[in-house]
């Protein structure tokens, strides 16, 4: 599809102004999921549809104010929920929501932790309190920080025994690969993971190739979320290195 797009754009460039070529490039990219930002309800819908069964548990890593989790709970209110948010401001907001809904949702565990591939304290950088772009990796516009506890997921889950981890959402501003390495052997128990790829990976010097190779090693298929639904990425190609926020779903072929 991408090679067809490039041929079409090359032909168009001979007969139309550059701004039109740019428009068609963005349109083709968007239709194939590049830079496509669906609603949270749409993301959850696609994940549950691809999962094919009602999940017993859900993990969100990088919760912010909990909007994604709220959409999940609308669909599967009885599942066990594990939430990880390192920011004290955001943690307080989520905690308030849970306390308010505790009679309805008594199945939520909240952790004031960042998840990565190490167990230690680190700086969490942000531009303003409560920012959705807080990150363990400092970016040029982030001039503030707080010290947070960082843990590996396999360390946290030593005391939480799950036969299978059904549904995971990761949004950690470019730290996704570090976070995934912290799963250790738990990754083999995971059925589905939704994650983002975009310009935050530039700061980490990470590429889609790195994410692809990680999931491929553990027999996951990767799909990109598009306006037309999920499209399977059959093999890695360099044109996947598109540093505009896009959403992906990885699903384990083995369980």
What are these regions (language model features)?
Residues 1-255:
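Phosphate/nucleotide-binding beta-alpha loop and adjacent structural elements of enzyme active sites
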């Amino acid at each position: 599809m991408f090679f067809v797009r490039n041929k079409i754009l090359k032909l168009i460039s001979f007969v139309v102004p550059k701004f039109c070529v740019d428009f068609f490039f963005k349109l083709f990219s968007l239709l194939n999921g590049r830079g496509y930002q669906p609603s949270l309800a749409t993301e959850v819908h696609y994940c549950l549809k691809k999962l094919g069964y009602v999940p017993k548990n859900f993990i969100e890593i990088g919760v912010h104010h909990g909007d994604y989790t709220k959409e999940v709970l609308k669909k599967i209110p009885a599942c066990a929920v594990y939430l990880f948010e390192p920011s004290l401001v955001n943690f307080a907001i989520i905690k308030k929501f849970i306390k308010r809904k505790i009679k309805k949702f008594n199945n939520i565990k909240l952790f004031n932790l960042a998840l990565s591939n190490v167990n230690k304290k680190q700086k969490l950088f942000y531009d303003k309190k409560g920012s959705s772009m807080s990150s363990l990796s400092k970016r040029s516009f982030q001039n503030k920080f707080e010290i947070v506890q960082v843990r590996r997921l396999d360390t946290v889950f030593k005391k939480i025994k799950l036969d299978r981890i059904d549904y995971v959402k990761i949004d950690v501003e470019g730290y996704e690969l570090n976070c995934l390495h912290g799963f250790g052997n738990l990754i083999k128990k995971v059925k589905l993971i939704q994650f983002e790829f975009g310009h935050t990976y530039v700061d980490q010097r990470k590429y889609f190739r790195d994410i692809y190779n990680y999931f491929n090693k553990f027999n996951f298929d990767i799909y990109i979320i598009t306006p037309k639904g999920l499209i399977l990425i059959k093999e890695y190609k360099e044109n996947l290195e598109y540093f505009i926020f896009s959403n992906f779903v990885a699903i384990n072929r083995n369980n």
